[in-house]
Amino acid sequence: MKQIIFDKSLSLFDEVVAIRRKLHKYPELSFCEKETSSVIKDYLASKGIAFETDVAGYGVVATVVGTAVLPGGATIALRADMDALPIKEESSCEYRSVNEGVMHACGHDAHTAMLLGAASIIHDLRGSFSGKIKFVFQPGEEKLPGGASLMLANGALKDVDFVVGQHVFPDLQCGCVGFHQGPFMASCDEVNIIIRGRGGHAAKPSERSNALLAAADIVSRLSKMFPESDTVALRSDGLLCFGSLIADGTYNVVPPQVSMKGTMRTFNENKRASMKSIISALSHDTAALFGCSADVFIENGYPSLINDNALTEKCRLLASEYLDPSKVLDIPQMMTADDFAFYSQAFPSCFYRIGVSNVSKGIDSKQHTSTFDIDEDALQIGTGLMSFIAISLCNNIILL
């Protein structure tokens, strides 16, 4: 089966590359993926694969039912996100974005193309497995409330046993894949704080309450409690980073209010709840010390992404079977977030990373940058690997 899938992924390579380049050239922002959805539907229809449309907006869910009479018979969901980012692409490649200010800078074009290729392979091989495989083409990963939460609310993953997803990763060389068991990616919530004081003349402190001083003290206190650090030991306590502090005063004018915006991240849901309480209480108490008040609003983002230990180990072993075992790596936790986390909170899930960088080809830009690109050789790897994992899981092939 491994060789059959590899050969099919090789024969589909040009198709998958063409799809990826088309999507890259015509990117669409979150929940606006109308033409992207059309590309997906047209390809699935051309392969004779059944699908549902307009799920959670422009989402598409395709299904292939295995016809083999074999033990196992699991239902597996494979997920790809499909939205782009509000970034102006700076590239000279022939497939660079023609939609001004919109770019596939996170690799969702590649995710979609690889999942379409996997759907084609799995459909061709439906006589070799039992069970059911769903292909979830999800809108809106980059924007709250996250397309994953809406797909779940729409029942798109009803009766699913496992969910598997892959994400391009420029920190790994093309040819490698990375796995991590347990808490893998952080939760991500948006922190909004408004400090209200009494504005006035800079030279008359008795006539004003300085909201700017209160805001600065809040940032200082919270930063000591939840420091920015690249070490996992400190990350386990949570990370809070403020990226915006706006005080609309001037040289001799103290503003009546200051707004602050930041991101809050942790791997632990209990810690997530306690951080929210601490941020709110400390902000109110500190503001009061300066004769000010605080309005605190923390918008729930994505929960922490938890890879199921047993499923992730199975997927890692299957990857070692499909690829050169030396290319299958253990990778550390990441403070970045992905709404695949919603699936991981609802079902046993595995979210792994696929390497896409190639320094020798000059492909090494990071995600969410204007020059991001991938070594397209990774498309064949991702297409074949996802197919092999899904069919093996359906047939209950456990390499333990």
State the predicted function of each range.
Residues 77-79, 88, 191-193, 351-357:
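Non-cysteine beta-strand/loop elements that form the S-adenosyl-L-methionine
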Residues 216-400:
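Metal-dependent amide/peptide-bond hydrolase catalytic core
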Residues 24-26, 104, 108-111, 167, ...:
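Histidine-centered active-site/metal-ligand motif
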Residues 1-21, 27, 124, 128, ...:
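N-terminal hydrophobic/helix-forming segments and targeting peptides
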Residues 23, 78, 108, 135, ...:
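Divalent metal-coordination and catalytic microenvironments
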Residues 64, 195-197, 264:
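Hydrophobic beta-strand positions in extracellular immunoglobulin-like domains
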